[in-house]
Amino acid sequence: MKNSLLFILLLFSTFAFTQTPTNAPGLEYVCELKVKLNPPYVVGETPHGLRRIIPIIGGTVEGPKINGEILNGGADWQIVRKDGVAELEAHYQLKTDDGVIIYIKNLGLRVATPEVAARISRGEKVNPSEYYFRAIPKFEAPTGKYDWMNNAIFVCTGERNPDNVSIKVWKLL
């Protein structure tokens, strides 16, 4: 009897731990940011890796939830680690088509082989399937129409193009 009970408990616990969670969050597409950049300022090698500051000089915001333009004046403060991974920390702002200014802080990673990273650095068009570029943007909007952006978690994919960075943003549901 004890062995049967132990077997049933073991079977149940194995079954319980192998089930796929049913409460995985969904995603809702918000917009695409096309961010224009100037050439980087290269600080050089630091204890953390190669520091680069990439000025953000403009761009567009298009999507079902928000539209507008990226304003001049932001930057991406990147560290390229010894393993070649670029740690991204971008701070910039957008202006919606109805005149609202929204601050963005975007933290992420771009992972590529040394060969792919060199092609990206030279400004070549590289298929985004050849590298991993993901980030977590945080929006800070004033009270009003875009206040919903203050109370949500977002994720994004990135694509480095020769003349911009394309960032597709989803709200985590």
Q: Each PLM stretch: what is its role?
A:
Residues 1-22:
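Bacterial Sec-dependent N-terminal signal peptides
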Residues 19-173:
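Beta-strand-enriched cores of mature, soluble protein domains
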